[in-house]
């Protein structure tokens, strides 16, 4: 029992010792935990302070970066402005130098031509003087021979009087012959002088034409610069209006409801005034453009017959544009080919490097991956070849279509040229027919009934636009020509709107006007008595009818007067119908290149 008690007491002591040790260890752990917690708090505070410092530095650096970026933007804007100013000044200097050089060249050309003309005249005068000198020498020799013969005849006293009279007549005839020869030589000299003068005048005409073309180009450049200045002025006016609106911002005023309403009313009034000003300016510009368009129409009416090579010029421009487009595509494809070759070389280098690096590794694993990659590569190569074949087919189709469109365009332009030639020949034949009728047809033939003559139904809107344009073009000065591009576009629109009978319906179905949808009896015009056509031809030629047959229109029957009234009514209707004008840009677009596309 005592042994058990002692054992239990020993165990109790051991347990108490262990409990004391555990308590000591717990106290030590608590102390360490408090120390670690305090260290953690200190670290957290330090981290917060450092984070705040970093954030402040970050914001400061961001502000500095923003300021520097703004400064860079302002500097870049100033640099761009200076570049533009320098560029504009350089362009102005180049233009001035070009003009001065051109003026000097013109002056030198004029001097050279004058010197050439003077040299030709001097050579001609020298040649004429030589001819006169030779002629005078011949005359002198003839006179000396005559004097010698006369002296011999006087010496011979046995000569009869008849022989002397014949000799005197012979000398008189020779004198007349020499006088006629001198007159012929003088006339030849005058003819040569006139030919030389004509050649010099032709050279002057060519030079004046070149100067006129250069002046037209200068006028075009001036007009373009004026349009740019107008656009810039309008932009500046719009910016000024925005600046005034921002200066009168209602947000800077009071917050009351009435003040906001008043501010809005003032802003709307300002906008209304701006819109009125814009409306007035646009109205003036529209009136100016209308006047310009009328002048251009009058000038175009005089230039309609000189428009033979314009279709060829437009076709040449279109072909040049297509050539530039194809050259750009070729350059782009060559660049892509170079890129693909570079990529292929890099890929081969990478494959060689990877093969050398992986050769030292396990060969069994690499064979599987290489086979897999080889299969994928073969598959991709097949797909690439198929896509290349499809691409080549598409390119061939595109080339075929482009060639087809070019052939169609060539046929179209050839047909238009033949149409213009046939129209001009038709007009000439009609003019000749009317002149022959007025010259050789008696007046009694006019009173023959109309049923016995052959009639031909013609649309009366054939000559009305050219008639009105030619009649108005006689009173206008055609010395000033506007822009060439606007002239071409307006000319095309004028022909599309007024001369719809000239173009086939398959090419421009959206522009044809149904002028002949309702045929009437008044539209039948006889080919025998057609005073309206003669008047049209005289108005197109710009000359008033001066023949006595045209002044006696009051003696014609009433049918001719009724036809005149009908033609005047139809002319008014045609002039009212042909008021729609479409403005076409001078740039070559794919829609404008060929209407069949």
UniProtKB/Swiss-Prot annotation:
Modified residues (N-acetylmethionine): 1
Record carries keyword Signal: no
PTM description: Monoubiquitinated with'Lys-48' linkage. Deubiquitinated by USP45.
Modification Phosphoserine, positions: 508, 547
UniProt record, GO biological process: cell division; cell migration; establishment of mitotic spindle orientation; mitotic metaphase chromosome alignment; mitotic spindle assembly checkpoint signaling; protein localization to kinetochore
Coiled coil: 1-445
Compositionally biased region (Polar residues): 540-549, 583-597
Residue spans of biased composition, Basic and acidic residues class: 550-574
Major localisation: cytoplasm
Protein name: Protein Spindly
Species per Swiss-Prot/TrEMBL record: Rattus norvegicus
């Amino acid at each position: 029992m005592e042994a058990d008690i002692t054992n239990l007491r020993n165990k109790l002591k051991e347990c108490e010792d262990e409990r004391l040790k555990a308590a000591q260890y717990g106290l030590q752990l608590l102390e360490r935990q408090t120390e670690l917690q305090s260290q953690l708090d200190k670290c957290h505070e330090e981290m917060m302070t450092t984070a705040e410092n970093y954030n402040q530095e970050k914001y400061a650096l961001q502000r500095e970066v923003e300021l520097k970026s703004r400064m860079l933007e302002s500097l870049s804007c100033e640099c761009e402005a200076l570049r533009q100013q320098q560029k504009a000044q350089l362009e102005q200097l180049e233009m001035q130098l070009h003009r001065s050089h051109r003026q000097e060249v013109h002056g030198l050309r004029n001097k050279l031509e004058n010197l050439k003309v003077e040299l030709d005249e001097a050579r001609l005068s020298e040649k004429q003087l030589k001819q006169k000198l030779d002629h005078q020498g011949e005359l002198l020799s003839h006179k000396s021979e005559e004097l010698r013969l006369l002296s011999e005849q006087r010496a011979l006293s046995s000569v009869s009087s008849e022989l002397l009279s014949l000799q005197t007549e012979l000398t008189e005839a020779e004198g007349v012959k020499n006088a006629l020869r001198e007159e012929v030589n003088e006339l030849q000299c005058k003819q040569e002088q006139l030919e030389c003068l004509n050649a010099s005048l032709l050279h002057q005409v060519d030079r004046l034409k070149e100067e006129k073309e250069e002046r037209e180009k200068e006028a075009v450049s001036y007009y373009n610069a004026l349009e740019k200045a107008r656009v810039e002025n309008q932009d500046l006016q719009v910016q000024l209006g925005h600046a005034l609106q921002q200066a009168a911002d209602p947000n800077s005023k009071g917050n009351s409801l009435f003040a906001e309403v008043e501010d809005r009313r003032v802003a709307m009034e300002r906008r209304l005034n701006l819109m009125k000003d814009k409306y007035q300016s646009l109205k003036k510009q529209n009136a100016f453009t209308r006047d310009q368009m009328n002048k251009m129409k009058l000038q175009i009416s005089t230039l309609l017959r000189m428009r033979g090579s314009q279709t060829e010029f437009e076709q040449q421009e279109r072909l040049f544009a297509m050539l530039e487009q194809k050259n750009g595509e070729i350059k782009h494809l060559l660049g892509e080919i170079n890129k693909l070759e570079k990529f292929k070389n890099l890929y081969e280098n990478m494959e060689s490097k990877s093969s050398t690096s992986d050769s030292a590794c396990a060969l069994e694993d690499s064979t599987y991956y290489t086979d897999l990659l080889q299969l994928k590569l073969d598959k991709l190569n097949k797909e690439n070849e198929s896509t290349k074949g499809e691409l080549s087919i598409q390119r061939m189709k595109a080339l075929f279509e482009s060639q087809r469109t070019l052939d169609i365009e060539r046929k179209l332009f050839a047909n238009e040229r033949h149409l213009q030639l046939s129209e001009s020949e038709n007009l000439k034949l009609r003019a000749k027919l009317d002149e022959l009728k007025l010259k050789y047809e008696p007046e009694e033939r006019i009173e023959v009934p109309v049923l016995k003559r052959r009639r031909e139904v013609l649309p009366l809107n054939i000559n009305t636009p050219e008639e009105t344009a030619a009649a108005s073009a006689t009173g206008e000065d055609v010395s000033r020509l506007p822009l060439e591009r606007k002239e071409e576009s307006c000319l095309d629109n004028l022909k599309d709107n007024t001369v719809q009978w000239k173009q086939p319906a398959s090419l421009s179905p959206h522009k044809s006007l149904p002028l002949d949808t309702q045929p009437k009896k008044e539209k039948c015009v006889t080919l025998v008595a057609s005073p309206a056509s003669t008047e049209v031809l005289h108005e197109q030629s710009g000359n008033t009818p001066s023949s006595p047959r045209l002044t006696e229109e009051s003696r014609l029957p009433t049918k001719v007067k009724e036809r005149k009234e009908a033609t005047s009514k139809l002319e008014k209707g045609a002039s009212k119908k042909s008021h729609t004008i479409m403005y076409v840009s001078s740039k070559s677009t794919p829609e404008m290149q060929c209407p069949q596309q």
